[in-house]
Amino acid sequence: MTRLAILSILCASTALFCACTSAPGRPGPHSEVLPPDQIMEFNILYAQNCAGCHGTGGSGGAGNALRDPIFLAIADDSVIRNATSNGVRGTAMPAFAQSAGGMLTDKQIDALVSGLRSWASSRGLHDANPPPYTAKTAGNAQHGAEVYQTFCSSCHGPNGTGGKSANSIVDRSYLALVSDQYLRITVIAGRPELGAPDWREDMPGRPMSDQEVSDVVAWLASRRATSPGQPYPDSKNAQYLEHHDVD
């Protein structure tokens, strides 16, 4: 047998051996996809469930910036866990826990809470004590109108309908989508990704008190439509309803 023939046989044998140990369609050692309820890595869980609203890396989007140090200073783990598990009624924040109709296990919720907490830092606080996450007393909408003029009108306009540097915050569609708690968080922590100041920065050297935050939130809440999403009374709607049968 010639050397060429022997070499050919060896090559064929090697190829046959490799083919037997690596059958077509056989997954590699690192190619298996975990079932959704077994994914525990924070970055994956956040990207799949949170980033769409709260931004990549918690930078903010339609929802508030979860990486904001002020938010993490006032929202403890139980607050974050409850909102993640059960959602926030009356807002676009859904429930993620399986026990509340979502897709995540309790352990996955814990992984998200721990991951978010790892973002906490004292950066930007400078030993300041922000108002608490939850209001201590009910807000006074009438006084809130005065608070608004003092702290907010320079950006959002005298009536809240928008100014030179900020949009309307009394838009009925907007107020229908956010809760009082969301408004409170926004007043306290601001929206740094949008250039909105926190509770200390509206008037340098004069931070808002807890009661002032509660009062301005009450004033904003008083501007909500009673039945969001329904036709609002105006002359055009009245004329239409007068001449059409509407079931």
Feature-to-residue mapping (PLM):
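Gly/Gly-Pro-rich "capping" loops immediately C-terminal to redox-active cysteine motifs
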Residues: 32-39, 43, 55, 59-86, ...
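Basic side chains
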Residues: 3, 81, 117, 184, ...
